[in-house]
């Protein structure tokens, strides 16, 4: 047996196979973090969705805190808000959108204003002066105070109440009083009752680093220059000013002006580094299937009561995109949208020294491609994880442990269990039957009957090749091993005369097409041409189809499988998430080896779609379903009337491959295989067999350990159980076996393994 050598952890191959640009492009396809439609329409980018979420729970304090993030004066803004968000509410497609503005007003009316933070904030050194009154100066004063600029306001008004009234005289007196209290609590300096003439203003301008003014004062200071509406600045006069037409315009202009102040004090261009201002276009996708329209709650002249506001807020459907997470166990288990998970996985690949916490999530993906089909933008999590695995391998940061057993199984399939023969009587063959490694491991009798049928009924000759297509090393990111498999398969195909491959597995079809560019067809295509075998018979009860991941995007194969089942008299029911949306059974991407719990949940997700027996056309799917106690059949079992063993363990799977090879050599090519015989027997308790299968310990591993024991006689006697314990290191793993000696050989009670090396002292 050839073992895979694990590279040293200190040796680094500086070959990065994942570029940041490619990852950024992929992450940009995920729309989960895109703003909701109402949020995108708001020039202030208020998180309307979150505000309505808290309002629906009756938590007006938190809802108000969200509203206060966008404006220093919520009563004034909500009174003059034109609610562009309402027209963009997704519910408008089904009826009435949410009355966001009225809910907003109720939040401001009933919500408890948050206390100003007691945390010390460092004031900026640069000073600002604001001349005049009105909506724009008021909002700007609040914005600059948030940014911690020492700000002085010069105005004609005599007190805070008058200053608020000059800006928002339309408010109720009680509301004006509340906003005046809010203004008074701010860290601002006011000089009331000023005579705002030119000499006074110019004198005070000398005391400030940045000058801001109402439009009226600005026109007096710079009558021939208008403010640039993009930056709210008269650039020649260096005066920040804004419009006073409406509450919304003034509040938005104040935000722009505050950013301009930031840039000016840093001696930067006021046109640069402004980011995205105002309303934006969102790429968010929200599936409205199953959502019903409703009428908005009637609102009287006095606005909503608390209870009415809560009911109206409850109508919000909290627009978001989690389509991929609904169908994918992997994403739903980690509770992270693909964009975030992909970013964390990419960052994991860039860690040079230390732990790599995202190795397990990276290896838990089934690489099935379901997310790509479901996502409206085609986000491919499988490509992210596959590239990350390759990157970790190429930089020598991927441990061998998660995938070693599967890789060793592939090497076994392509060495001891490998077979490549022309059909007797042919020098070259038109076809070669490639059933796949899992078919030979789980259903060897089916493989034999299928090959016998094909070789008898297909013109031009059908060769046979038993082996692995290389999908295992491809999934593991071990691209060098995949290249060796590809080279082996190419050489064998050339020796057979470059025949057309008849694949018995959709994953093999996909892998062989993509990796070696072979001409591959499915066995189902051939059987549709030549007709069903005589023994073909469907089940007499309705069955559910589970579509294989390898057939995703292959409508021809999906249709052909259904047609074959119909021809056999099967009553077929399609399930939710079928065809291209079909989930993975848990075997794909080597999830079953790297994360057994995740794989079990994937299998459960597949089986919960129907109570009927499952028909598959992937042998790995059929095996995983049978292990969960569900009646399942591979379509070839129905076509050839031969049932596979229900639950072959990992040792039986290898044994089945060897027996299949030896039987075919003997029966078809008249070659008598040489069988190695031992002069002792090894038996296993039921507990040992179950434990070995669970821990992926082969009988051949145990027998190698016992063979070493026979040579060195090294073992520990457990006085209590009278069992012997011996060990041996095979490849990268030390195996331990607990056994007793019998008359004929050994009885194994338990077996376990560790990735450790036992060192012996010299001379002891």
Predicted regions and their residues:
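Cofactor-cradling patches in redox/metallo enzymes
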Residues: 166-174, 438-525, 550-569, 573-663
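Ferredoxin-type iron-sulfur electron-transfer modules and their immediate structural context
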Residues: 1-120, 127, 181, 213-364
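Acyltransferase donor/substrate-recognition loop-hinge adjacent to the catalytic core
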Residues: 531-542
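Conserved small-residue-rich
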Residues: 40-41, 127-151, 157, 286-342, ...
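Ribonuclease/tRNase effector modules and their secretory precursors
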Residues: 645, 649, 655, 659-764
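Hydrophobic alpha-helical positions that pack around
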Residues: 545
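Short glycine-/small-residue-rich Rossmann-like dinucleotide-binding loops
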Residues: 215-217, 376, 506, 619
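Iron-sulfur-cluster electron-transfer modules
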Residues: 36-39, 49-209, 335-504, 509-519, ...
């Amino acid at each position: 047996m050839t073992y895979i050598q694990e590279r040293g952890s200190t040796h680094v191959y500086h070959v990065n196979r994942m570029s940041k640009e490619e990852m950024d492009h992929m992450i940009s396809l995920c729309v989960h973090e895109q703003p909701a439609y109402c949020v995108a329409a708001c020039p202030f980018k208020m998180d309307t969705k979150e505000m309505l979420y808290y309002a629906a729970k009756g938590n007006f304090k938190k809802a108000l805190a969200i509203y206060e993030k966008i404006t220093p004066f919520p009563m004034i803004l909500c009174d003059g808000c034109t609610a562009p968000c309402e027209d963009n509410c997704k519910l408008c497609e089904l009826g009435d959108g949410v009355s966001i503005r009225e809910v907003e007003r109720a939040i401001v009316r009933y919500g408890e204003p948050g206390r100003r933070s007691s945390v010390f904030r460092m004031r900026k050194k640069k000073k600002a002066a604001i001349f005049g009154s009105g909506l724009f100066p008021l909002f700007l004063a609040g914005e600059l105070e948030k940014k911690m600029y020492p700000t002085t306001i010069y105005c004609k008004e005599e007190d805070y109440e008058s200053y608020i009234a000059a800006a928002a005289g339309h408010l109720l007196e009680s509301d004006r009083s509340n906003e005046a209290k809010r203004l008074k609590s701010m860290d601002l300096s006011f000089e009331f009752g000023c005579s705002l003439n030119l000499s006074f203003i110019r004198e005070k301008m000398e005391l400030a680093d940045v000058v801001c003014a109402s439009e009226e004062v600005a026109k007096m200071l710079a009558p021939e220059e208008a403010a640039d509406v993009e930056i709210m600045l008269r650039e020649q006069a260096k005066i920040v000013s804004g419009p006073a037409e409406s509450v919304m315009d003034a509040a938005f202009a104040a935000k722009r002006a505050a950013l301009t102040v930031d840039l000016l004090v840093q001696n930067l261009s006021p046109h640069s580094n402004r980011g995205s201002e105002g309303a934006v276009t969102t790429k968010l996708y929200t599936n409205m299937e199953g959502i019903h329209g409703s009428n908005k709650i009637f609102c009287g002249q006095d606005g909503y009561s608390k209870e009415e506001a809560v009911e109206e807020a409850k109508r919000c459907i909290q627009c978001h995109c989690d389509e991929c997470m609904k169908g994918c166990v992997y994403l739903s288990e980690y509770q992270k949208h693909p964009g975030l998970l992909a970013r964390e996985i990419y960052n994991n690949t860039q860690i040079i020294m230390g732990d790599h916490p995202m190795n397990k999530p990276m290896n838990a993906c089934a690489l099935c491609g379901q997310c790509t089909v479901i996502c409206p933008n085609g986000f491919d999590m499988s490509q992210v994880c596959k590239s990350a695995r390759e990157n970790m391998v190429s930089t020598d940061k991927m441990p061998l442990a998660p995938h070693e057993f599967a890789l060793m199984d592939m090497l076994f399939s392509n060495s001891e269990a490998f077979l490549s023969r022309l059909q007797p009587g042919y020098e070259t063959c038109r076809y070669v039957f490639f059933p796949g490694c899992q078919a030979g491991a789980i259903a060897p009798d089916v493989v034999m009957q299928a090959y016998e049928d094909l070789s008898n009924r297909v013109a031009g000759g059908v060769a046979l090749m038993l082996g692995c297509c290389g999908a295992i090393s491809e999934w593991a990111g071990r691209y060098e091993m995949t290249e060796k498999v590809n080279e082996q398969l190419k050489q064998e195909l050339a020796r057979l005369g470059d025949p057309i491959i008849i694949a018995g597995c959709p994953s093999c079809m996909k892998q062989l097409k993509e990796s070696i560019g072979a001409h591959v067809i499915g066995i189902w295509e051939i059987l549709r041409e030549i007709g069903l075998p005589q023994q073909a018979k469907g089940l007499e009860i309705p069955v559910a189809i589970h579509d294989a991941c390898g057939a995703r995007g292959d409508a021809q194969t999906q249709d052909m499988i259904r047609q074959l089942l119909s021809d056999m008299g099967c009553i077929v029911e399609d399930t939710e998430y079928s065809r291209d949306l079909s989930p993975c059974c848990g075997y794909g991407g080597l999830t079953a080896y790297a994360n057994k719990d995740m794989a079990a949940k994937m299998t459960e997700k597949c089986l919960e779609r129907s109570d009927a027996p499952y028909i598959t056309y992937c042998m790995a799917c059929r095996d995983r379903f049978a292990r969960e106690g569900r009646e399942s059949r591979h379509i070839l079992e129905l076509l050839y009337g031969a049932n596979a063993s229900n639950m072959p363990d990992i040792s039986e799977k290898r044994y089945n491959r060897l027996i299949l090879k030896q039987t075919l050599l003997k029966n078809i090519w008249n070659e008598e295989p040489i069988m190695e015989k031992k002069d002792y027997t090894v038996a296993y308790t039921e507990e040992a067999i179950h434990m070995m299968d669970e821990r992926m310990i082969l009988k051949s591993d145990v027998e190698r350990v016992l063979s070493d024991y026979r040579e060195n006689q090294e073992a520990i006697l457990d006085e209590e159980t009278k069992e012997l314990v011996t060990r041996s290191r095979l490849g990268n793993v030390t195996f331990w076996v607990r056994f007793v000696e019998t008359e004929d050989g050994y009885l194994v009670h338990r077996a376990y393994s560790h990735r450790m090396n036992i060192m012996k002292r010299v001379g002891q």
